[in-house]
Design a protein with these regions (language model features):
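Helix-turn-helix
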Residues: 2, 21, 29-63, 67
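Short, leucine-enriched amphipathic alpha-helices that occur as contiguous helical runs
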Residues: 15, 19-27
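Short, basic, alpha-helical segments at the C-terminal edge of helix-turn-helix-like DNA-binding modules
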Residues: 70-77
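Short, hydrophobic secondary-structure boundary micro-motifs
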Residues: 113-116, 156-157
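Amphipathic alpha-helical packing segments from all-alpha helical-bundle domains
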Residues: 126-152, 161-173, 191, 197-202
Length: 237
């Protein structure tokens, strides 16, 4: 019984190693050749595995990219947890999470530029708003839900319900800026993060002011329309 469990564990570990090897090889080749010029056969050959084995772990190049999305999210989540446990203010929590997102993505900066050429297509399954990206998108929004829920900030209930989604959109905008940032050590990106997080924190604080209620309601109505539009696009694709 023990030997059977040991054999199963060894097989699982070997499978994970093979899966990681295929993904790492694919990312390297996608960076070198671009998305269109990289084939599953070429990935398998360079990784030293059979084509059937490559397809066993990843059904297509799209599945490889979704695995990349998932891996970078998991890296970001692990990096963010200590900061979220330490900080209680919304500003400090948001600043840490957004900065750590860029920290964890930085090793893939050049590849991200190549990937963006395909992911920017609204009809591409690699688009962050696409149906195929829904699991990672939900997990990422969940991180922002935890960020908001455990903060000590006073946030109106209607804004609190939509804030995680809005912060997810904000962080996607930061990533887009980072992709195009050629400054040394992405200094412009980090400066943008510092300034915009401070601005967002002030705006969220102002949202509790009774005089801001009509403006807040109108803004949240636009968010609802945006969500409805996104849902329609996902269904259409």
């Amino acid at each position: 019984m023990k030997s059977a469990r040991k054999a199963a564990a060894t097989k699982t570990a070997k499978g994970e190693q093979t899966k990681t090897l295929i993904l790492s090889t694919a990312l390297e080749m996608l960076h070198e050749r671009g998305y269109e010029n990289t084939t599953m056969r070429a990935i398998a050959e360079k990784a030293g595995v059979s084509l059937g084995n490559a397809y066993h772990y990843f059904g297509s190049k799209d599945h490889l990219i979704q695995a990349f999305y998932h891996r970078t999210h998991e890296d970001h989540l692990r990096a963010s947890l200590p900061a979220l446990e330490k900080e209680s203010s919304l500003k400090a929590r948001l600043l840490a999470v957004i900065r750590l997102k860029i920290d964890t993505l930085e090793p893939y900066h050049e590849f991200a530029g190549v990937l963006f050429q395909t992911a920017a297509d609204p009809h591409s399954p690699l688009n962050p708003f696409a149906h195929a990206a829904a699991p990672v998108r939900r997990d990422s929004i969940k991180l922002f839900e935890d960020l908001v829920a455990s903060s000590k900030a006073r946030i109106p209930d209607d804004l609190r319900a939509e804030l995680p989604y809005l912060l997810w959109l904000y962080h996607m905008g930061i990533i887009l800026f980072w992709i195009h940032d050629t400054s040394r050590k992405r200094a412009r990106t980090y400066r943008l993060i510092d300034q915009t997080v401070d601005l967002l924190d002030k705006l969220i604080s102002l949202a509790s002011n009774p005089l801001m209620r009509p403006v807040r309601k109108r803004a949240l109505k636009l968010v609802t329309e945006l969500r409805d539009f996104e849902a329609e696009e996902v269904e259409a694709n």
